[in-house]
Amino acid sequence: MCIRDRYSIDEFFMDVTDSYHRFSSTVHSFCIKLMKEIYEQTQIYCTIGIGSNMLLSKLAMDIEAKHNDNRIAEWRYQNVPEKLWNIQPLHKFWGINTRTEKKLNKRGIFTIGDLAHYPYQYLKRDFGIKGIDLHLHAHGIDQSKIREKHKITNPSICKSQILMHDYTYEDAKVVMQELIEDVAMRVRLRKMRARTIHFSFGYKDGGGVHKQFTLDEPTNLEKEIWKGVEKWANQLCEKELLYRTLSVSLTQFVPEGIQQLNLFVDEYERKRSEALAKAIDQLQEKYGKGIVSKAISYTDAGTKYGRLGLMAGHKM
């Protein structure tokens, strides 16, 4: 059996431990066949990293395979000293951003080899749980399993975006509203409402704000979702910093027909707003998402029209 776990819209992990032998004699030759089949069906060249775990396979792809003529690289535990420990600067390593890199540099850590040989107890003391992961990853150890990740216990509807240039906080909020507009429409098309919202604002130099909150009443209206997101973002985000990534996801769905009576909610206004939103949804389904837009999407900060017609960030 082959088990897959999607990492992004154009990357995924595959565990073929128990199945590659059905198609080829080695994992490497299996990957060659897979690449050929993908190209024949899509005319797209792909890159493959093979590893003893998810971490090593990802690093093999990012650091070596993308620069190989055959676009395949294989990293095993025995390759850790020669391939992993020479990686520098540190932010090239999966899971280390520039902010963490600066903290590590202050401790005399400039390569993954330095990190691997830095006392474990100090990493744990200074970085907590992340310090434990840094120690394990520097030795090529990744305890996560695709089989564990594959189970979907709480479905969600999400949208994320990597910004094309640095955004101020106020401009980033414009894009966040566009993302919320998208996920709210998708919830309405499923005839559902969402109760829990998770959002993130990622800083240019690494790090950022992540927040999850639960609404008193489930909703599928972007103005109600945005009200909660803006409230928490204004409290948590560093206004003077620049931003490069944004995301929002909705979970804990309930059918539209299930609604508890709330004396503090204007039921007439809520139904009126939902009816208007659904009318716009129908227009966008019929004529395309660009047919109706909010004024913010026409500002310099808006990205909606730039994203129309893109797949995985590429023009189709």
Regions found by a protein language model. Give the residues of each.
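Acidic, metal-coordinating catalytic segment for phosphate/diphosphate chemistry
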Residues: 218-316
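Short Gly/Ser/Thr- and Asp/Glu-enriched loop/turn motifs at secondary-structure junctions
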Residues: 7-11, 51-54, 192-196, 241-245
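Stable alpha-helical structural segments in soluble proteins, enriched in small hydrophobic residues
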Residues: 54-67, 138, 179, 183, ...
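Nucleic-acid-contacting surfaces of polymerase cores and analogous helical-repeat interfaces
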Residues: 4-166, 282, 295-316
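DNA-contacting surface of Y-family translesion DNA polymerases
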Residues: 92, 102-243
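Single conserved hydrophobic/aromatic residue that forms the stacking wall/gate
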Residues: 1-3, 288
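Short, hydrophobic beta-strand segments
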Residues: 12-18, 210-215, 260-266
